[in-house]
Design a protein with these regions (language model features):
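N-terminal strand-loop-strand
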Residues: 1-34, 61
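Residue-level detector of short, conserved catalytic/binding motifs and their immediate flanks
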Residues: 3-5, 44, 112, 142
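Short regulatory "switch" loops immediately downstream of catalytic or recognition motifs
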Residues: 8-11, 53-63, 118-123, 152-155
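Short, solvent-exposed coil/turn elements at secondary-structure transition points
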Residues: 11, 23, 37-39, 71, ...
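Intrinsic-disorder/low-complexity loop/linker signature
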Residues: 13-14, 64, 76-78, 87, ...
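Nudix hydrolase/Nudix homology domain
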Residues: 25-30, 90-186
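The catalytic Nudix box helix
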Residues: 33-89
Length: 186
């Protein structure tokens, strides 16, 4: 079992979706959600919340990204912030999540990815921190990317290979992106 989140935000009256990319390994070059496997005692939401904080190395909600480090204490301090965003989004739009195509019926994939509204943040400072890390402060070099809703829909329609397979396998994701657009863009 696992879960993820694709944050979205409004900037200049447009909806953008936040993805990450990596530079090494099997996910390199793809647009990736923030997600992973469940820890003991976690439900889908708790997993998605923790995974976002871990995979952004606690920088997204840090006041000083140069001092951000991924520690249990920092992760635990940010959980209530992200929980509140999940609560705010899902209390109004409880259907803004997708399951992953089950795949093999003998071993179906049990996965949920949530689409949650986050405050917009300029991600350049975060990306510079990852790029400048030579001492191993971060677990893996990543880069965050804001993707406009229209571009994301075009990728799903014409170039799904740009998406990490787990994001490609989300059932009804384009419909949720359309619903978010109808709800959020003027």
């Amino acid at each position: 079992m696992g879960a993820g989140v694709i944050p979205f935000a409004i900037s200049d009256c447009k909806v953008y979706f936040l993805f990450q990319t990596t530079f090494t390994g099997r996910k390199a070059g793809h647009l990736i959600d923030f997600g992973g496997g469940q820890d003991v005692g976690e439900d889908y939401r708790k997993t998605a919340i923790r995974e976002f904080i871990e995979e952004t190395e606690t920088m997204y909600f840090s006041d000083n990204v140069r001092q951000a480090t991924r520690t249990v204490e920092r992760i635990n301090n940010q959980i209530p912030i992200v929980e509140a965003l999940f609560d705010a989004t899902l209390s109004i739009n409880p259907h803004w999540w997708c399951r992953r195509t089950p795949g093999n019926p003998l071993r179906p994939k049990r996965w949920k990815t949530f689409f949650i509204e986050f405050p917009f943040r300029d991600i350049e400072a975060l990306n510079r921190e990852w790029e400048a890390d030579k001492a191993g402060r971060f677990k893996k070099r990543r880069e965050l990317v804001w993707v406009a809703a229209a571009e994301l829909l075009a990728i799903y329609d014409k170039a799904p290979e740009k998406l990490w397979k787990r994001v490609r396998q989300l059932e009804h994701a384009p419909e949720i992106v359309h619903a978010i657009l109808q709800h959020k863009e003027p």
